[in-house]
Amino acid sequence: MTLRDAVTKAVQQNPDVVLARLDEETARLNVRVAKDPFSPRVTVGSGLAYSNGFPMSVDGSPPSIVQARASSFIFNRQQSYTIAQAKEDARGAGMGVAGKREEVAYRTASLYVDAERALRAGELARKDADSLQKVLEAIHAQVLEGRALPLAEKQAALSVARAKQLAETLDADCMAAETALALAIGLTADDQVRPVAEARPVPPEAELGEGTISAALDRNTELRRLQSQIAAKGLEQRGAKAARLPRVDLVAQYSLLSTFNNYQAFYRQFQRNNGQIGMSFQVPVFAGTRVSADVAQAETEGAKLRVQLARARNQLSADLQASFREVKKAQTAAEVAGLDLEVAREQLSVDLAQMQEGRLPLRQVEEARIAENAKWIAFYDAQYALEKARWNVLRLTGNLVGTIETLP
């Protein structure tokens, strides 16, 4: 699986992303719940009863064969703020999904790079073991000829055993990395995802500047989510204050009365079908201490969120500056590792030429090959460290998912 395929699948089916989407859907449904009181609610029932004497009420209503009631909010400022708060919470939940996608994309890319590194390191370790095996065979021949001590053969055998042990360890690390990558993508623990050998383009390099940090702060989903929470708390505070405002409700009801409840005996006029529609006005006179407590609580929580927002902004700015420094350090290390590898490869070419001329034994050539493999591992480590550092910069600036999706 390529890096692009792995990240694309991860941002779709990773459990953390799925849970964030479910939270977003819950927040959207809460908006519908908050709007419900403004929709007419109609209930139909019956208060059927037999009356002996005066027709007394049944649950506050006269006895009736069929009874229907309808009610809804017409003006309720507190509930309107509750709806606005629910909408803001839904918007913040959407930002949480976007932030989780960036986080999962970076985690998946890091695991992919780790799995690819373990795979390549394992291949080089097996080559080292093969080279050391050839050295052991050469030393064994020298021991038989009396040109080397048996101790040298034992030391060579120990080197072979250590190389094989390292290869097995790297193979186990590769399997663990592939399993971790499968879990990040959203597969099961029984699955493994092996990276595809590909020539990926180097992640784009961003330049550090005031505009870069400012744009990253404006685009960061975590900061925007905190800003959304602060706005929601402001609406909650205004909604708590609105509890002191009057409210107007729509009320309507219909009753089908019976003739066996003695209405004719006690009322001059009687009709079976009865209905009424109107509005109910409520004006709070003494709201109690709860309103002021709710307002103070919302103010306190809003102040707490503002402190968290300031801390998150400072931390993000510091992380961005540190990430750019890490990119520069990794880039320098990659250049040094590349030069070191070139020297090792040139040395191996010289040793091979001397061996063909009979001026150098096979043992020294294989040792040079082992040294070259070690330089290859160091070179790969430096390249992967640079790649991960640049992915981290893209994550902090909010461009990671979009950049990876443009990969071939």
Predicted regions and their residues:
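Bacterial Sec-pathway N-terminal export signals of envelope proteins
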Residues: 1-47, 72, 87, 147-149, ...
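A glycine-/polar-enriched beta->alpha junction
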Residues: 8-18, 25-40, 67-85, 95-102, ...
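Amphipathic alpha-helical coiled-coil segments
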Residues: 19-34, 100, 104-125, 134-141, ...
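Small/polar, glycine/serine/threonine/aspartate-rich low-complexity segments that form flexible
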Residues: 45-74, 82, 195-206, 238, ...
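Periplasmic alpha-helical coiled-coil/stalk elements that build and connect Gram-negative outer-membrane
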Residues: 103-215, 326, 330, 350, ...
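Metallo-beta-lactamase
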Residues: 170, 221, 305, 382
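Long amphipathic alpha-helical coiled-coil segments
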Residues: 180-188, 388-403
